[in-house]
Design a protein with these regions (language model features):
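Flavin (primarily FAD) binding-site architecture
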Residues: 143-153
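Glycine- and aromatic-enriched mobile tails/lids
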Residues: 34, 40-61, 210-226, 237-240, ...
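Conserved redox-cofactor binding core of oxidoreductases
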Residues: 34-130, 135, 142, 186-189
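A short alpha-helix-loop-beta-strand transition element characteristic
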Residues: 15-18, 32-49, 89, 173-176, ...
Length: 460
């Protein structure tokens, strides 16, 4: 426990909440046992003991994994389990639009009120575009991150910051959005909306970051070399790329046991082959990509936001665990611990909830104009390019000012479109991306020292 706690605090660069770190580290093992009982299969050695991996900034082997797709394995087993439960209704192909508060009853809701209530959410059925009103005694945001506000990201297409944006519009407190973690090693040249991730565990297995002429460079930046924390590695790669005028560096696995590599990382091995890269003979071209949002909706030790009956867990929440930089693999542990804590707290008060008699219907004014779809697509691309070019690994005061100015114009255009056009998930996601981008920019402007993932050259 103590080593894990210290590693987390060091990675967080003095901005972790120590009590939250203690809770997650100490409660994590019990939560892991629960998901194993639900069917999650972590890799074991021939003796039947769990294989523990090591990743950047960890001082010991402690990471459970399922080959190179641990997240998928956890999702697979939990979805399978939840489909067996008669008391759970799953709404697939639905898009959360907004949280319902007193605002929708005509009251003025401000961020400094302590009696704001969440009554549920407006949700769009994507099969018929009808907006439903869902009443709830407790609402839990578990919507993930916002990597899609960047042009290059490891996040799936749905990671548009919807939960943070909805909570912010509902007047919940949101903080630490300036701390965006960039994964150092996304496969350069990945196709589609999502960059393919070359797991940190590959470096834990012994792969070495090198320049195009096959020279290691990480020792110049940190004595831990290729296993330094993600913020240090990402910044080092960014520096090497800019100083050499290249768009990527390389990850060298050629000296490793390739048969063992294939067993441990079958997806990575096969994907590299699809791109014409044989890891036994070729170095893997990699570049940093937006990966994880260390900030989010402020929540306490029970996952409660600053809005009554609104909870959050996972990447959407700012629990205080990660501080200025997340320790590799702590995210899955945090999600498990806070999902359990949200449930325990909700269970204590759910029977006392009295729902309002009539939630107002979603206002459907506006006309769909097919000509305007091009504006939505254009503005989405512009937001992603703006964030990638100006609000990336290294920032500056001038870039922050320019991005704020341009985002304001995009925001005004999009809000005008929102007022005159029937709602669509594409328009809803664009609004959310703009809200989240604005929070990242504004909180970056307020940050007056370089910490963890945040680096402003004017503060160096």
């Amino acid at each position: 426990f103590e080593k894990h706690r210290k590693d987390t605090l060091i990675a967080g660069d003095g901005m972790c909440e120590e009590e939250i770190v203690k809770i997650v580290v100490e409660e994590g093992p019990d939560r892991l046992r629960e998901i194993v009982d639900m069917g999650v299969r972590f890799d074991k050695d021939p003796n039947g003991d769990y294989q523990l991996g090591v990743e950047g900034a960890h001082s010991a082997k402690r990471i459970l994994h399922h080959q190179d797709m641990t997240g998928y394995e956890i999702q697979r087993s939990l979805v399978k389990k939840i489909r067996t439960l008669d008391n759970v209704n799953i709404l697939e192909h639905h898009f959360a639009v907004d949280l319902i508060t007193q605002h929708h009853f005509g009251e003025k809701v401000t961020r400094d009120r302590n009696d704001t209530q969440c009554y549920g959410a407006y949700v769009m059925n994507l099969e018929n575009n009808q907006v439903l009103k869902l009443s709830a005694g407790a609402t839990v945001l578990a919507s993930g991150g916002a990597g899609q506000v960047y042009d290059l990201t490891t996040n799936p297409p749905v990671a548009t910051g919807d939960g943070v944006a909805m909570a912010y519009r509902a007047k919940a407190e949101v903080s630490h959005m300036q701390f965006i973690q960039f994964h150092p090693t996304a496969l350069y040249g990945s196709k589609g909306d999502r960059a393919f991730l070359i797991s940190e565990a590959v470096r834990g297995f012994g792969a070495i970051l090198k320049t195009g002429d096959a020279k290691p460079f990480m020792k110049k930046y940190d004595e831990r070399g290729s296993l330094a924390s993600r913020d240090i590695v990402a910044r080092a790669i960014d520096t090497e790329m800019k100083s050499r005028g290249t768009e990527h560096v390389y990850l060298d696995c050629r000296h490793l046991d390739i048969d063992e590599f294939r067993k441990k990382f079958p997806t990575i091995y096969d994907t590299c082959l699809e791109y014409g890269i044989d890891v036994a003979e070729d170095m893997i071209p990699v570049a940093p990509a937006a990966h994880y949002m260390c900030g989010g909706v402020n929540s306490d030790e029970w996952g409660r936001s600053t809005i009554n009956r609104l909870y959050c867990c996972g990447e959407v929440a700012k629990t205080g665990l990660h501080g200025a930089n997340r320790l590799a693999s702590n995210s899955l542990l945090e999600a498990l611990v806070f999902a359990d804590r949200c449930f325990r707290d909700i269970k204590k008060s759910i029977d006392d909830y009295e729902a309002p008699r009539d939630l107002p219907d979603w206002k459907t004014e506006g006309t769909t104009d097919p000509k305007e779809w091009v504006l939505i697509n254009h503005n989405r691309k512009e937001v992603k390019q703006l964030m990638n070019n100006y609000i990336g690994i290294v920032r500056s005061n001038e870039r922050l000012k320019r991005s704020e100015k341009r985002l304001k114009v995009i925001h005004e255009e999009t809000e005008q479109l929102y007022k005159t056009t029937t709602l669509s998930p594409q328009l809803g996601e664009l609004r959310n991306m703009i809200n989240v981008s604005w929070l990242i920019i504004r909180q970056s402007m307020e940050q007056q020292e370089n910490r963890g993932t945040f680096y402003n050259i004017d503060l160096a």
